[in-house]
Amino acid sequence: MTAANQNYGTGRRKSSSARVFIKPGSGNITINQRSLEVYFGRETSRMVVRQPLELVELLDKLDLYITVKGGGISGQAGAIRHGITRALMEYDETLRPALRAAGFVTRDARRVERKKVGLHKARRRPQYSKR
């Protein structure tokens, strides 16, 4: 892929990291050499990936080439959405206010809370026995 007339954005969510390249085209979305429909079986994940493009009405005007690694399905979809948003802002800075208002620009900083000693999970305490 040549560097001419393409824009790049990096997205992260949980432990997933996505690299997104956008260039003018017909709306093809390729994720790790597979189509969006093949890569994400769940419609929810596909919808999350398409959200920023639908918001700025560029879904069928840009081709996306994406590599994503780490994490699970939900985290990867979120990372891709974040990466697409950043690439779109590099492509056209006037899209920033609309993307910001939709909440796509902000990196979701929530992480998995660690398990503590003496507890079952991060916050789940052992059952209390009165007697």
Swiss-Prot record:
Gene designation: rpsI
GO cellular component: cytosolic small ribosomal subunit
Source superkingdom: Bacteria
UniProt KW keywords: Ribonucleoprotein, Ribosomal protein
Statement: the UniProt record of this protein carries the keyword tRNA-binding: no
GO biological process, one term: translation
PANTHER family: RIBOSOMAL PROTEIN S9 (PTHR21569), SMALL RIBOSOMAL SUBUNIT PROTEIN US9M (PTHR21569:SF1)
HAMAP family associated with the record: Ribosomal_uS9_B (MF_00532_B)
GO MF term set: RNA binding; structural constituent of ribosome
Protein name as annotated: Small ribosomal subunit protein uS9
PROSITE patterns: RIBOSOMAL_S9 (PS00360)
InterPro entries linked: Ribosomal_Su5_D2-typ_SF, Ribosomal_uS9, Ribosomal_uS9_bac/plastid, Ribosomal_uS9_CS, Ribsml_uS5_D2-typ_fold_subgr
Family: Belongs to the universal ribosomal protein uS9 family.
Pfam families xrefs: Ribosomal_S9 (PF00380)
